[in-house]
UniProtKB/Swiss-Prot annotation:
The organism's place on the tree of life at top rank: Eukaryota
GO cellular component: cyclin-dependent protein kinase holoenzyme complex; nucleus
Name of the molecule in the record: G1/S-specific cyclin pas1
Organism encoding this protein: Schizosaccharomyces pombe (strain 972 / ATCC 24843) (Fission yeast)
Molecular functions per Gene Ontology: cyclin-dependent protein serine/threonine kinase regulator activity; protein kinase binding
Family: Belongs to the cyclin family.
UniProt keyword list: Cell cycle, Cell division, Cyclin
Region Disordered, residue ranges: 210-253, 307-326
PANTHER family for this protein: PHO85 CYCLIN-5, PTHR15615
InterPro entries referenced in this protein's UniProt entry, alphabetically: Cyclin-like_sf (IPR036915), Cyclin_PHO80-like (IPR013922)
Length: 411
């Protein structure tokens, strides 16, 4: 990574960290003088920890999640309202979540200079604030990557520009601070969708311009430059210098109103040669940031599977299943589909049970019939009276004893 890209990356990360400062001001927290600037602190922490870009993105997303969780009671998390401490704790959580072998707390203590006991207290306070929700959905992480990537690209364009009329990134950093201050962690509100749509429009227009320029002759092709204007076109009321503090964060509604006059486009996707390409003939009306993800509802899935006699193709569940979530079984026989059995069907069966269901519960099924009752007559005698069709019940017991070993082998 070049020095310009590294500097732009640090500047964009600093804007995300500055977005929590209004929360720190609401608790009347005093500002302390530090020996290192925020950018220098980020550079030293990243250099010593040797983390990758994905870990940094996840750590910055934990910033937004912590800010939304602590906004209701910020006085309970005053030690974490420092940008340096919170960045260190978020980086620790992201490293431990993504990597199987990460640094210990003692190593993080030597890296940061904080005592181990203080790091443990800060880490526990952070986990308690976000309710131990470290998992980020795929579509949310894709949107967050697009948002932070645009900020990095904007900073890189400012540093690479040799035009003296182009202002530095420090003069427009206040717009990005206000953007990250109003973005919610879910990234599905009106303001977040408006910003993401505008970013997607800009990138599509830049790609279309480059494609048109490549098709023309070099002599007649005009020189086009990428638009480096900020996402928020809000002019500050007073001139702000590079070293001054950013103005107070505006509300979400005025910024969203300025982003309102924007044509949301439709995406015309053509399937050719088993690949999807975006057509540039007509303007797209919807930006497909991610392909739609279909998830299985665990409350509807058992009843649906019990009513089907043929295997169905359902999307797999996440890698870390929760209680009550269904996951696919390994294929063993019968054309690659493994047999599994339902407890209710087994208890009410009148013959050999061969339900062809491709999914089985993670938890063991609680079958009310045990196989140590002795004989079939003892099993029938244990049932409440009056009872009809005892001959079928005896057959039921024989079927259950035959399939009990098979049923246990699948779970």
């Amino acid at each position: 990574m070049s020095k310009v890209n590294m500097r732009a990356l640090l500047e964009s990360f600093s804007t995300v960290i500055l977005s929590i400062y209004p929360l720190a001001k609401s608790t009347n927290q005093q500002s302390h003088s530090h020996s290192l600037s925020l950018t220098q602190f980020l550079y030293e922490t990243i250099r010593r920890s040797r983390v990758d870009y994905t870990t940094l993105l996840l750590a910055l997303y934990y910033f937004i999640r912590f800010r939304d969780a602590a906004s209701s009671k910020p006085t309970n998390y005053i030690p974490l309202l420092c940008g340096r401490r919170l960045f260190l704790v978020c980086l620790m959580a992201a490293t431990k979540f993504l990597q199987d072998r990460s640094f210990s707390n003692r190593a993080w203590s030597r890296l940061s200079g904080l005592p181990v006991d203080k790091l443990l207290v800060l880490e526990y306070m952070f986990y308690q604030c976000i309710d131990y929700r470290l998992v980020v959905p795929k579509h949310i992480f894709a949107r967050w990557s697009l948002l932070v990537g645009e900020c990095c690209a904007h900073a890189t364009a400012r540093y690479d520009s040799t035009d003296p009329n182009v202002a530095s990134f420090g003069s427009v950093a206040q717009y990005w601070v206000s953007l990250f201050s109003n973005v919610q962690s879910s990234l599905d509100d009106l303001f977040s969708i408006a910003c993401l749509t505008k970013i997607a429009h800009r990138r599509m227009n830049a790609n279309a311009a480059l494609k048109n320029q490549a098709t023309r002759k070099p002599s007649s092709s005009p020189q086009t430059t990428q638009d480096s204007s900020p996402i928020l076109t809000m002019a500050p009321s007073t001139p702000v210098s590079v070293g001054s503090t950013p103005p107070s964060t505006p509300s979400v509604l005025p910024i969203a109103k300025q982003l309102a006059p924007m044509n949301v486009c439709k995406a015309h996707i053509q399937a050719s040669n088993q690949s999807r390409t975006l057509t540039t003939a007509s303007p797209p009306e919807q930006i497909p940031l991610m392909e739609p993800q279909v998830y299985v509802n665990p409350q509807v899935l058992p009843g649906r599977l019990s009513s089907l006699s043929k295997p169905v193709s359902l999307p797999p569940t996440p890698s870390s299943p929760k209680v009550g979530v269904y996951r696919p079984m390994t294929s063993k026989s019968n054309g690659g589909v493994a047999y599994c059995y339902n407890a209710q069907k087994l208890n009410n069966a009148t013959g050999p049970v061969t339900f062809n269901m491709p999914f089985a519960s993670v938890l063991p099924l609680a079958v009310s019939v045990s196989c140590d009752l002795g004989t079939a007559s003892a099993y029938v005698a244990s049932l409440p009276q009056p009872c009809s069709q005892k001959r079928h019940l005896e057959e039921d017991y024989s079927c259950l004893t035959e399939h009990s070993a098979k049923r246990r082998s699948y779970f």
